[in-house]
């Protein structure tokens, strides 16, 4: 009897995940952002094919592994991202709100804002994150020629954490 219950739960989980994945193309048409589904249990991230035009990923029907996703994350940001994903995977967090860099098809660093929320069953056994990646957030903060943060971004950083006086 328990085996049948587990099968039904697994089947429901798979159907629910597929439902969200099928919604992606419809939502994707209405925005410049990239919406994603992260199946935490299966360790796969799903995007529409549109992301492959900007980033060096091959179109995958069955989603991307975390290894594939990390291949386009800037090396300096990988550790931070992995720490965040592990907290989510362990159930310590149910949201993600990170800013990090991806490397596009031209080899250019692109600052992104990545936000998502976990949808899970009551026991947090089958977590699925639904979220979005936005590139436009940082376009006002970055010098297009050098890729360095500009004075507006520096002023925002100083407002958050003023320089400590040394003496």
Briefly describe each language-model feature range.
Residues 16-70:
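PAS-family sensory domain signal
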